[in-house]
Amino acid sequence: MSTNAVFAGIDVSKAHLDVAVRPDEIEWRSPNTDTGAREVADRLKDLDPDLVVLEATGGMEIPAASALAVLGVPVVVVNPRQVRDFAKSTGRLAKTDALDARVLAHFAEAVRPEPRP
């Protein structure tokens, strides 16, 4: 990975995809629809991330993860418990979708889970 590595986290809810990108502190929200997932994937591809992390959310993460994978963006769907434990260890106990996206991006940077096809 390059010295200017870019990591993104996407917090997935039924209605929205909240995205956070490190280290540039870029954040945005898109609708959690097929079109919204493609827009997120296109925008992230332009940022050339080293890794994008999403939590498993009972299948709601699949459109976004699939859109990223189709574009060749390295993406990992992780167990929410792993991320929750990571957040606790870093003292980030606040709970909003935007903060969760930031924690996911930090998790991607610190842990660097391996992308799987």
Language model features with spans:
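Phosphate- and other anionic-substrate recognition elements at nucleic-acid/protein interfaces
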Residues: 1-117
